[in-house]
Amino acid sequence: MIDAAQVDHLARLARLELTPEERQSMQADLNSILGYFEQLRAVDTDGVEEMQRPEDLVNVLRDDVPGEVFPPEVVAALAPEMQGGFVRVPRTVEAE
């Protein structure tokens, strides 16, 4: 399991300054996490088929078919401002 020296090493790598209480807490937390991995490692998985996820997900796609197109007059009536037959919108990207 993880000892205090390893916790200190990890703290230095992560540039953390731990108090003695935080060091003890971190050591206990890391040992708990590693203990959980040991439990997982002990599970017999022989004969279990590998999978990426527990459910078979399938994308439901629709055909890309053009729908109703609004006449230019309707678009112009809905737009706040038109310029040269196009809808004018506020600038969203500033030039560098």
UniProtKB/Swiss-Prot annotation:
GO terms for molecular function: asparaginyl-tRNA synthase (glutamine-hydrolyzing) activity; ATP binding; glutaminyl-tRNA synthase (glutamine-hydrolyzing) activity. Its EC number is 6.3.5.-. GO terms for biological process: glutaminyl-tRNAGln biosynthesis via transamidation; regulation of translational fidelity; translation. Keywords: ATP-binding, Ligase, Nucleotide-binding, Protein biosynthesis. InterPro entries: Asp/Glu-ADT_sf_sub_c, GatC. It catalyses: L-glutamyl-tRNA(Gln) + L-glutamine + ATP + H2O = L-glutaminyl-tRNA(Gln) + L-glutamate + ADP + phosphate + H(+); L-aspartyl-tRNA(Asn) + L-glutamine + ATP + H2O = L-asparaginyl-tRNA(Asn) + L-glutamate + ADP + phosphate + 2 H(+). NCBIfam families: gatC. Heterotrimer of A, B and C subunits. This is Aspartyl/glutamyl-tRNA(Asn/Gln) amidotransferase subunit C. It comes from Deinococcus geothermalis (strain DSM 11300 / CIP 105573 / AG-3a). The gene is gatC.
